[in-house]
Amino acid sequence: MSASVLSVISRFLEEYLSSTPQRLKLLDAYLLYILLTGALQFGYCLLVGTFPFNSFLSGFISCVGSFILAVCLRIQINPQNKADFQGISPERAFADFLFASTILHLVVMNFVG
């Protein structure tokens, strides 16, 4: 069973590295960074506590919101989804991402106090 799992993972990595555009790989690295940051914050919350609760909540909401916005950007700029987003150029999708991220972080900073 482990051999089949390893073969699936190696085939996935080969296809990902060969067929995924550089823009999407960069965005995937950003998504991994946000995911690890959120997991680190949650682990810190479990181990140490949530004394400044607003700060923890703001940071975690920022991670979750940023992850969701980045996934939406990835879906919109993926060349395989070109038919679904005919009226939206990659530049427009990125501008929408920047605008939504700015609003998200303004709300998060307001929540911190």
UniProtKB/Swiss-Prot annotation:
Molecular function in Gene Ontology: enzyme activator activity
Subunit-structure text:
Component of the oligosaccharyltransferase (OST) complex. OST exists in two different complex forms which contain common core subunits RPN1, RPN2, OST48, OST4, DAD1 and TMEM258, either STT3A or STT3B as catalytic subunits, and form-specific accessory subunits. STT3A complex assembly occurs through the formation of 3 subcomplexes. Subcomplex 1 contains RPN1 and TMEM258, subcomplex 2 contains the STT3A-specific subunits STT3A, DC2/OSTC, and KCP2 as well as the core subunit OST4, and subcomplex 3 contains RPN2, DAD1, and OST48.
UniProt keyword annotations, A-Z: Acetylation, Apoptosis, Endoplasmic reticulum, Membrane, Transmembrane, Transmembrane helix
Q: Which residues cross the membrane?
A: 31-51, 53-73, 93-113
Any one biological process term the GO annotation gives: protein N-linked glycosylation
The membrane topology noted for this protein in its Swiss-Prot or TrEMBL record is:
Multi-pass membrane protein
What family does the database annotate?
Answer: Belongs to the DAD/OST2 family.
Q: Which PANTHER family would you find in this protein's record?
A: DOLICHYL-DIPHOSPHOOLIGOSACCHARIDE--PROTEIN GLYCOSYLTRANSFERASE SUBUNIT DAD1
GO CC list: oligosaccharyltransferase complex; oligosaccharyltransferase complex A; oligosaccharyltransferase complex B
Question: What protein am I looking at?
Answer: Dolichyl-diphosphooligosaccharide--protein glycosyltransferase subunit DAD1
What pathway is this protein said to act in by its record?
Protein modification; protein glycosylation
| Record function comment | Subunit of the oligosaccharyl transferase (OST) complex that catalyzes the initial transfer of a defined glycan (Glc(3)Man(9)GlcNAc(2) in eukaryotes) from the lipid carrier dolichol-pyrophosphate to an asparagine residue within an Asn-X-Ser/Thr consensus motif in nascent polypeptide chains, the first step in protein N-glycosylation. N-glycosylation occurs cotranslationally and the complex associates with the Sec61 complex at the channel-forming translocon complex that mediates protein translocation across the endoplasmic reticulum (ER). All subunits are required for a maximal enzyme activity.
Primary location group: endoplasmic reticulum
Q: Report the locations given in the UniProt record.
A: Endoplasmic reticulum membrane
> Where is the organism placed in the taxonomic lineage, from the top?
Eukaryota, Metazoa, Chordata, Craniata, Vertebrata
